[in-house]
């Protein structure tokens, strides 16, 4: 009888653990759904308003504070009509040639990148689309991790569903990093070329587009070879 009592006494403990585990799982799912819904509201609001700041901008500010370095932010969002078509075309040619036709992910480009990485036996360029980069800038950080990629892959379809391609491009051109504390086309064109974004010529636009992959290290004046490659891509597309 004593043995039976011990067995019976052990069952409630197992049942309690299962209940707690179930509660944790349900709580985690509810939290994830709540965050997803909050992101959906934020993305929907971006149809009409520009973000006052972004996750990447906040990351840079915190990093500067922790390192005791000065931080000066230059961020002046402007409508797409005030951004030179030269820059719009240069950025699309450089970063996401199939931007207008895909739905957030460029599977063809991803396959090419994967094949190149396998051949080189190391990870190379990311192959992220403009939409993916926008999501990273708005909601995530510059840190590379599987968790960040997972969150990115859940948010990209939402952005594509709720925003037009023109609005996605407009937001992207206004929030991406173009140098230390320099965010967006207007700030970048004023800083590097001393003209508003609406007045950028083809060469200036190509040089700005060329530094996007590594904005804290590259300088437009040093991008002769890559900027020419971008100009060639633009010409092939009819831009």
Named regions from a protein language model:
Residues 2-239:
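Juxtamembrane regions of bacterial inner-membrane/periplasmic proteins
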């Amino acid at each position: 009888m004593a043995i039976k009592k011990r067995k019976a006494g052990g069952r409630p403990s197992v049942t309690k653990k299962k209940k707690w585990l179930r509660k944790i799982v349900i709580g985690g799912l509810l939290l994830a759904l709540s965050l997803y819904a909050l992101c959906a509201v934020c993305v929907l609001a971006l149809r009409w308003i520009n973000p006052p700041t972004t996750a990447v901008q906040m990351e840079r500010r915190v990093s500067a504070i922790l390192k005791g370095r000065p931080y000066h932010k230059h961020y002046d969002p402007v409508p797409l009509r005030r951004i030179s078509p030269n820059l719009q075309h240069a950025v699309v040619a450089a970063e996401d040639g199939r931007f207008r036709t895909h739905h957030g992910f460029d599977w063809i480009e991803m396959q090419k990148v994967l094949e190149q990485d396998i051949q080189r036996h190391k990870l190379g360029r990311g192959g992220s689309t403009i939409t993916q980069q926008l999501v990273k800038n708005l909601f995530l950080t510059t840190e590379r991790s599987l968790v960040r990629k997972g969150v990115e892959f859940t948010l990209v379809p939402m952005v594509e569903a709720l925003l037009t391609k023109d609005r996605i491009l407009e937001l992207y051109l206004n929030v991406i990093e173009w140098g230390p504390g320099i965010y967006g086309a207007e700030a970048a064109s004023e800083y590097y070329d001393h003209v508003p974004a609406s007045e950028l010529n083809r060469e200036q636009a190509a040089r700005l587009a060329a530094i996007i992959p590594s904005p804290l290290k590259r300088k437009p004046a040093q991008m002769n070879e890559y900027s020419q490659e971008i100009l060639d891509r633009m010409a092939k597309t009819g831009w």
